Amino acid sequence: MQAPKFDKFKKYFNRKKASIDEVVRELTAGGIVFRRNKAGEIEILLIKDPKGRWSIPKGHVEEGETAQETALREIAEEAGLKETEAICWLGKTHFRYRRLTTLVLMTTQIYLVKALNPEERAQKEEFYEEIKWFAFNDALEAVEYEDISKLMLLAMKRIRHAGH
């Protein structure tokens, strides 16, 4: 009796991913946007992306723009909030992903941003599924990325310390 031939399986399992031909760095910036509701409680703005993940408004830094300017521009574009103020820099996150044969190394600068007009209505960009103001603890629970969660805790500490 002959052993079964596993040539088809060998071909399948021996396939390798295409090699990385290029490594690119992308700089992005965003903001943890907060406001006080009518009861005086802190609320955090989150946006749900097309994959159903809650996160903060953020995007690519354009030429000639500072990271802080990018954060405020992205908040205006993605959330429709024009009356905002960057309070302070909170930190940065690092993320990497593969785009075919390119390895993308993304660094995102995150700012604490205050919505100056609590009556200004947040309006999502067409690209996003949903936009919503969350109570702080609910936002912390909803956000998908651990590094953003950690910066949200720092944001709350800064908000309380500064009396915003």
Name each model feature, range by range.
Residues 1-37:
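Acidic, metal-coordinating catalytic segment for phosphate/diphosphate chemistry
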Residues 4, 12, 141-164:
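Charged phosphate-binding loop/patch that engages nucleotide di/tri-phosphates or the phosphate backbone
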Residues 37-43, 100-103:
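Short, solvent-exposed loop/turn segments that connect beta-strands within catalytic domains
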Residues 45-48:
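Short, acidic/hydrophobic/Gly-rich beta-strand patch recurrent on exposed beta strands
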Residues 50-53:
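Short connector loops/turns at beta-strand edges and beta->alpha or beta->beta junctions
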Residues 55-58:
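A short gly/proline-enriched turn/hairpin at secondary-structure junctions
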Residues 61-150:
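Unchanged
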